[in-house]
Amino acid sequence: MFKVRVIPCLDVKDGRVVKGINFVDLRDAGDPVEAAIAYDAAGADELTFLDITATHENRGIMLDVVRRTAEACFMPLTVGGGVRTVDDIKTLLRSGADKVSINSAAVARREFVKEAAEKFGEQCIVVAIDAKRVPGKDRWEIFTHGGRKGTGIDAIDYAQEVVSLGAGEILLTSMDRDGTRQGFDIPLTSAIADSVPVPVIASGGVGNLDHLVEGIAKGHATAVLAASIFHFGEFTIRQAKEHMVRSGLPMRLDP
């Protein structure tokens, strides 16, 4: 069985972490590279950077962040946000990203997923899905543009389609749960994870360590992504992993 992964996520705007980080030993809580180094030392399996910079002109700042992080850290790095072209992917991979996450651009043009997977390999193409339950129904709709724009597209159908086109992994965020600290949307997570043959990363709603276990055991995800429970020093990566091991999940634990 694959080892379950624990993945912290950093939102970066204009080269700075925006949600804030409260690590004890960080000299500069707003510097994403400092935060990445701390997570690497703490035993994170991977790290996800989400570039929420509004302007394309500041893209160079993010590339510098990726470069400096890749030089300083051993863990795999996924970068997403504003990825619209094959050239965007190439530049990020050359800067040191191991995987690139695409979201709105894949919804707008599905062929983009196929082109990216054929050029760079399925293993480094992640499709990020932001989904929200359709009121009164047992189905979920895809949203784009940072969750602001509904599409009417069914989340399960879309997940299956992008995987058939070459997505090697799905990063699934429940918009209903994001920021609530009430736990993952288990029906959504399991519905997607059970419908595709690639790894699914559960995201949105983690408030305690049991939620991480539930994402895997009940949601059938292969990895869990969280932000605030780690950023603010509430729990360490090691505490999360040890709790998951005690729950019977296969984890990579550094000595």
Swiss-Prot record:
Catalytic activity, reaction form: 5-[(5-phospho-1-deoxy-D-ribulos-1-ylimino)methylamino]-1-(5-phospho-beta-D-ribosyl)imidazole-4-carboxamide + L-glutamine = D-erythro-1-(imidazol-4-yl)glycerol 3-phosphate + 5-amino-1-(5-phospho-beta-D-ribosyl)imidazole-4-carboxamide + L-glutamate + H(+)
Enzyme class, first EC level, given as a word: lyase
EC number: 4.3.2.10
Keywords: Amino-acid biosynthesis, Cytoplasm, Histidine biosynthesis, Lyase
GO cellular component term, pick one: cytoplasm
Name of this chain's protein: Imidazole glycerol phosphate synthase subunit HisF
Gene Ontology MF terms: imidazoleglycerol-phosphate synthase activity; lyase activity
Species this protein is from: Rhodopseudomonas palustris (strain BisA53)
GO biological process terms held by the UniProt record: L-histidine biosynthetic process
Highest taxon listed in the record's lineage: Bacteria
NCBIfam families: hisF
Stated family: Belongs to the HisA/HisF family.
One Pfam family in the UniProt entry: His_biosynth
GN (gene name): hisF
Compartments (UniProt record): Cytoplasm
Function according to Swiss-Prot or TrEMBL: IGPS catalyzes the conversion of PRFAR and glutamine to IGP, AICAR and glutamate. The HisF subunit catalyzes the cyclization activity that produces IGP and AICAR from PRFAR using the ammonia provided by the HisH subunit.
Subunit structure: Heterodimer of HisH and HisF.
Pathway: Amino-acid biosynthesis; L-histidine biosynthesis; L-histidine from 5-phospho-alpha-D-ribose 1-diphosphate: step 5/9
Gene3D superfamilies with a match to the protein in the record: Aldolase class I
Active-site residues, as the UniProt record annotates them: D11, D130
HAMAP family referenced in this protein's UniProt entry, alphabetically: HisF
